[in-house]
From Swiss-Prot:
<dbReference type="InterPro" id="IPR000871">
    <property type="entry name" value="Beta-lactam_class-A"/>
</dbReference>
<keyword id="KW-0732">Signal</keyword>
<keyword id="KW-0046">Antibiotic resistance</keyword>
<dbReference type="Pfam" id="PF13354">
    <property type="entry name" value="Beta-lactamase2"/>
</dbReference>
<dbReference type="InterPro" id="IPR012338">
    <property type="entry name" value="Beta-lactam/transpept-like"/>
</dbReference>
<protein>
    <recommendedName>
        <fullName>Beta-lactamase SME-1</fullName>
        <ecNumber>3.5.2.6</ecNumber>
    </recommendedName>
</protein>
<keyword id="KW-0378">Hydrolase</keyword>
<dbReference type="GO" id="GO:0030655">
    <property type="term" value="P:beta-lactam antibiotic catabolic process"/>
</dbReference>
<feature type="binding site">
    <location>
        <position position="239"/>
    </location>
    <ligand>
        <name>a beta-lactam</name>
    </ligand>
</feature>
<comment type="function">
    <text>Class A beta-lactamase which confers resistance to the beta-lactam antibiotics, including penicillins, some cephalosporins and carbapenems, to JM109 strain E.coli. Acts via hydrolysis of the beta-lactam ring. Has penicillin-, cephalosporin- and carbapenem-hydrolyzing activities.</text>
</comment>
<dbReference type="GO" id="GO:0008800">
    <property type="term" value="F:beta-lactamase activity"/>
</dbReference>
<feature type="binding site">
    <location>
        <position position="135"/>
    </location>
    <ligand>
        <name>a beta-lactam</name>
    </ligand>
</feature>
<keyword id="KW-1015">Disulfide bond</keyword>
<feature type="binding site">
    <location>
        <position position="133"/>
    </location>
    <ligand>
        <name>a beta-lactam</name>
    </ligand>
</feature>
<feature type="active site" description="Proton acceptor">
    <location>
        <position position="172"/>
    </location>
</feature>
<comment type="similarity">
    <text>Belongs to the class-A beta-lactamase family.</text>
</comment>
<feature type="binding site">
    <location>
        <position position="76"/>
    </location>
    <ligand>
        <name>a beta-lactam</name>
    </ligand>
</feature>
Length: 294
């Protein structure tokens, strides 16, 4: 009996030691990554916000992850998900034809401009908003189907995101004024919401597959998170660029080879209105974050 007890005790203690060793290794990686991001931030001369999740191990890494950053166009990834969630509830028809006129289109509406005579399906408009950052598609969808910026915020609250807030339309939401809370979220909230929508149970399997394919087909992110991973890893992302205060961002679901998916959210902003954004900074922050959760 004594030998059995001793064996069980030894096994338990061994398991605890392994767990502590893994925890310490991850903590050391996180500390090293934070120092690297801090140096990157100093070189960038602005703020960098990061949150990353390994959905397999549960490891996370954050840097300024609870601070607010301007969303810019990155909210359009969640707009597309909001459309699909309503399609799932049979409140909207993804094949519904949407008609519009030139006066409905804002600057940078590359896809909706092509079809302003014939119109587009709701699904094609949603994918254009995500994959091409089409502002015409974005505003039309928000106005006619989602209840405007307030409706977008309500949708995000419905999935448990209490940080996201959308206050204005395209193009007004891109001011990115330091300290302005309008049209902002946090890197951690963005990553968690993406995890719920792209990999979780908010969307059923059929609709979720559509959403994942839309993310994978994004055309605007090649120089950002996509540039931080091996070529054979699959990435689905949504970028944002405000065009002011060097503000730009990207968030992604990453499917590595033979591993569970990763979630990465990178937000950047600078001090002066005329400062330029840096795709390389976003890519490097992503690379560091992925190493930290490995």
């Amino acid at each position: 009996m004594s030998n059995k007890v001793n064996f069980k005790t030894a096994s338990f203690l061994f398991s605890v030691c392994l767990a502590l060793s893994a925890f310490n290794a991850h903590a050391n990686k996180s500390d090293a990554a934070a120092k690297q991001i801090k140096k990157l931030e100093e070189d960038f001369d602005g703020r960098i916000g990061v949150f990353a999740i390994d959905t397999g191990s549960g490891n996370t890494f954050g840097y300024r992850s609870d601070e607010r950053f301007p969303l810019c166009s990155s909210f359009k990834g969640f707009l597309a998900a909001a459309v699909l969630e309503r399609v799932q509830q049979k409140k909207l028809d993804i094949n519904q034809k949407v008609k519009y006129e030139s006066r409905d289109l804002e600057y940078h509406s590359p896809i909706t401009t092509k079809y302003k005579g014939s119109g587009m399906t709701l699904g094609d408009m949603a994918s254009a908003a995500l994959q091409y950052s089409d502002n015409g598609a974005t505003n039309i969808i928000m106005e006619r189907f989602l209840g405007g910026p307030e409706g977008m915020t309500k949708f995000m609250r419905s999935i448990g995101d209490n940080e996201f807030r959308l206050d204005r339309w395209e193009l007004e939401l891109n001011t990115a004024i330091p300290g302005d809370k309008r049209d902002t979220s946090t890197p951690k909230a963005v990553a968690n919401s993406l995890n719920k929508l792209a990999l979780g149970n908010v969307l059923n399997a059929k609709v979720k597959a559509i959403y994942q394919n839309w993310l994978k087909g994004n055309t605007t992110g090649d120089a950002r998170i996509r540039a931080s991973v091996p070529a054979d890893w699959v990435v689905g992302d949504k970028t944002g660029s405000c065009g002011a205060y060097g503000t730009a961002n990207d968030y992604a679901v990453i499917w590595p080879k033979n591993r569970a998916p990763l979630i990465v959210s990178i937000y950047t902003t600078r001090k002066s209105k005329d400062d330029k954004h840096s795709d390389k900074t976003i890519a490097e922050a992503s690379r560091i974050a992925i190493q930290a959760i490995d």
